[in-house]
Amino acid sequence: MSNISKETVEKVANLAKLEVSETEATAFAGQLGKIIELVEQLNTLDTTNVEPTSHAIDVSNVLREDVATKGLDRKEVLKNAPDEQDGMFKVPTIMEQ
């Protein structure tokens, strides 16, 4: 059985930069203790004949084939640009050199 103290909840909340009241810390301590007890029950399961998996269901790659196609012409792309210079998009300076 795992006991989570109110102090442990407050310490973890502080590390996570979360504010919890005394009432919340007490409530969370009880709730987290119950959650840990439920998870600890999984350790009692016999998994000797269970295949290891990374997904609960079979997952297959459903992406299309990667086929190269002709892209847009530079002039066509730049005609929608708010500003361009030497055949490239011109953007406002955000840093000085």
From Swiss-Prot:
One of its GO terms (biological process) is translation. Its EC number is 6.3.5.-. One of its GO terms (molecular function) is glutaminyl-tRNA synthase (glutamine-hydrolyzing) activity. InterPro entries: Asp/Glu-ADT_sf_sub_c (IPR036113), GatC (IPR003837). It comes from the Bacteria. It holds the Pfam family GatC. The keyword Ligase applies. Allows the formation of correctly charged Asn-tRNA(Asn) or Gln-tRNA(Gln) through the transamidation of misacylated Asp-tRNA(Asn) or Glu-tRNA(Gln) in organisms which lack either or both of asparaginyl-tRNA or glutaminyl-tRNA synthetases. The reaction takes place in the presence of glutamine and ATP through an activated phospho-Asp-tRNA(Asn) or phospho-Glu-tRNA(Gln). NCBIfam families: gatC (TIGR00135). PANTHER family: GLUTAMYL-TRNA(GLN) AMIDOTRANSFERASE SUBUNIT C, MITOCHONDRIAL (PTHR15004:SF0). Belongs to the GatC family. This is Aspartyl/glutamyl-tRNA(Asn/Gln) amidotransferase subunit C. It comes from Listeria monocytogenes serovar 1/2a (strain ATCC BAA-679 / EGD-e). The lineage of its organism: Bacteria, Bacillati, Bacillota, Bacilli, Bacillales. The gene is gatC.
